[in-house]
């Protein structure tokens, strides 16, 4: 058994960062470091790792061409063993959630596990639904944080999750618009390839606007300081979404740097959420 291969296939850096993001989300949701922070880290890390493994399992034919050095196509891990490894990691992550955290958090963990499996197996190839799935998984990290306080906690962080989902979906769509030539060459069925770059940009703007509106709902929770800070961040996000409006092809979309601006806006909003949760 190649231990290094089994470690690398979970994308350890990616999984650890996701686990730390889970702790950060719980701080934003509760205003302090919860007693269950270690379990949150373990749950997010193992389920993220499982998602990475199952993704490699279903992508093994593509990776044999594009990423032949990865553990499965290189022969370091047998596909069947990778499948069992993914199942084991999913069971560990969900087992920890069931045993050591509130039921709502365990429910989210199980739901996310199902979505990760469905995404790897076929949703990633489904126009828009795949984008929605990825965006939800990113936003659900805040639902994890809120779920520490039960159902009421989930409700309290819903605007944060909604704002993250909206902006993340906008960025996913814009990235697909940037990647149209490569996706077309590989036979992908992305939203921009099916419905055109203009429809994609308009949908991204609508999604980003929805995210911005959701972020404003938190004014009642954190007050005027938060509102002033988030309006500045929201302006960056809307600027990023609008900046690509004149693009007629992928090259112009890349030059507009919309996805990079949206990414900067997302990181800035995360900082505002964190400071508001801790200080206000």
UniProtKB/Swiss-Prot annotation:
Pathway: Membrane lipid metabolism; glycerophospholipid metabolism. GO terms for cellular component: plasma membrane. It is an enzyme of class 2 (transferase). Its main location: membrane. Its cofactor is Mg(2+). Pfam families: UbiA. It comes from the Archaea. GO terms for molecular function: geranylgeranylglycerol-phosphate geranylgeranyltransferase activity; magnesium ion binding. Gene3D superfamilies: UbiA prenyltransferase. Keywords: Cell membrane, Lipid biosynthesis, Lipid metabolism, Magnesium, Membrane, Phospholipid biosynthesis, Phospholipid metabolism, Transferase, Transmembrane, Transmembrane helix. InterPro entries: DGGGP_synth, Prenyltransferase_related, UbiA_prenyltransferase, UbiA_sf. The chain crosses the membrane at residues 4-24, 27-47, 83-103, 104-124, 128-148, 150-170, 199-219, 222-242, 260-280. GO terms for biological process: glycerophospholipid biosynthetic process. Disulfide bonds: none annotated. Belongs to the UbiA prenyltransferase family. DGGGP synthase subfamily. HAMAP family: DGGGP_synth. NCBIfam families: PRK12882.1. Prenyltransferase that catalyzes the transfer of the geranylgeranyl moiety of geranylgeranyl diphosphate (GGPP) to the C2 hydroxyl of (S)-3-O-geranylgeranylglyceryl phosphate (GGGP). This reaction is the second ether-bond-formation step in the biosynthesis of archaeal membrane lipids. This is Digeranylgeranylglyceryl phosphate synthase. It comes from Methanospirillum hungatei JF-1 (strain ATCC 27890 / DSM 864 / NBRC 100397 / JF-1).
């Amino acid at each position: 058994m190649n231990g290094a291969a089994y470690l690398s296939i979970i994308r350890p850096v990616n999984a650890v960062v996701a686990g730390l993001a889970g702790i950060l989300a719980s701080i934003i949701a509760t205003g302090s470091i919860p007693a269950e922070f270690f379990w949150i880290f373990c749950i997010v890390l193992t389920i993220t790792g499982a998602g990475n493994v199952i993704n490699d399992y279903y992508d093994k034919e593509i990776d044999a061409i594009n990423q032949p050095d990865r553990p499965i196509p290189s022969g370091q891990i047998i596909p069947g063993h990778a499948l069992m490894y993914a199942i084991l990691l999913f069971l560990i992550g969900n087992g920890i959630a069931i045993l050591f955290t509130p039921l709502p958090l365990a429910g989210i963990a199980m739901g996310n596990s199902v979505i990760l499996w469905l995404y790897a197996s076929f949703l990633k190839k489904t126009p828009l639904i795949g984008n929605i799935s990825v965006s939800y998984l990113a936003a659900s990290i805040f639902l994890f944080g809120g779920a520490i306080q039960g159902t009421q906690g989930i409700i309290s962080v819903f605007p944060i999750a909604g704002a993250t989902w909206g902006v993340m979906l906008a960025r996913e769509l814009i990235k697909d618009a940037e990647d149209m030539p490569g996706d077309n060459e590989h036979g992908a069925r992305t939203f921009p390839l099916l419905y055109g770059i203009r429809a994609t940009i308009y949908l991204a703007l609508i999604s980003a606007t929805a995210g911005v509106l959701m972020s404003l709902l938190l004014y009642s929770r954190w007050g005027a300081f938060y509102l002033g800070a988030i309006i500045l961040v929201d302006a960056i996000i809307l600027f990023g979404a609008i900046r690509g409006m004149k693009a007629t092809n992928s090259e112009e979309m890349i030059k507009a740097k919309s996805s990079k601006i949206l990414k900067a806006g997302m990181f800035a909003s995360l900082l505002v959420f964190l400071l508001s949760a801790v200080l206000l």
